[in-house]
Amino acid sequence: MPKIAFATYLSLPSLSDNDRLLVPIFKENGFEIKAEIWDDESVDWFKYDAVIIRSTWDYFLKSEKFLSWISKFKNTKTQLFNSPEVVLNNTHKFYLKSLQQKGVSVIPTWFSSQKILIEELKGIQKIVIKPAVSGGSYETEVFETKLLSQEILDKKIKQGDWLIQPFLSQIKENGELSLIFLGGEYSHSIKKIPKKGDFRVQKQFGATYKHFEPDLKLIEKAKNIVQLAAENTLYARVDGLEIENEFLLMEIEMIEPDLFFEYTKTGPLDFVNATIKYMKN
């Protein structure tokens, strides 16, 4: 019986409610599933046929350790999903710059690995500053530029790489769109709406989610983004905003995204079928 480990983290060592929906389908297809904490040194990862990253939601707090763990799966019989190459590239949000250069419409962004002058931000009322390695709005802040001094800006981005973006009020009005792809094919979408007075779209900050049906044009645009970002992805989630009928990419999640299976009837089966397909290749 083939064995698959779902990589989790210490604060949620068992499977998430979403991932539990996958287990009976995997079992029906002859697979054994077990949750394993990604940084548990006692785990023998290579006894598994495959490891699927699902809820390693503290990886950005231990980024060097996480990158080292991912690299262990290079050139091994144990398949990692997504692949080490895909994951290593996706951990640092400067991948957006590469996608921008390939013609993808990305939210206007300053990619800061060095000093940014306050004068460069003139004409923008509010900005969002976020770390290039992060998740779940970790250390993401909104600033009014008229109240922002060079000293405050320098202090905020003094270490590491950061993204600076104009704050787009449309996220409060229209919500953020998430389009999920499984095995490279479109599966389903949701709209995430922040609570009144907030901009963050995570449920822990009071956001609400609902099913969303994108048109074919948007699906094709998102699929093109996935194809430009990486090949042979088991899962990918394209997050962005629609502004004046243009889709602007915020990020593409290919490490440990919530795939929102509760908003789709076919998603869990599609996920399992894509896994089986990739494991055979």
Task: Locate predicted features.
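Active-site nucleotide/adenylate-binding loops and adjacent lid/helix of ATP-dependent enzymes
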Residues: 2-8, 70-77, 83-174, 216-219
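Conserved N-proximal alpha/beta basic substrate-recognition cap immediately N-terminal to
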Residues: 10-108
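Short, solvent-exposed loop/turn segments at secondary-structure junctions
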Residues: 11, 57-58, 134, 169-170, ...
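Phosphate-binding site of ATP-dependent enzymes
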Residues: 144-226, 230, 241, 248
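ATP-dependent carboxylate activation and anion-phosphoryl transfer catalytic cores
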Residues: 216-281
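A short beta-strand motif that forms the metal-chelation/ATP-contact edge
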Residues: 48-53, 130, 178-181, 246-258
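A short, glycine/Asx- and small/polar-enriched loop/turn
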Residues: 44-49, 120-124, 243-248
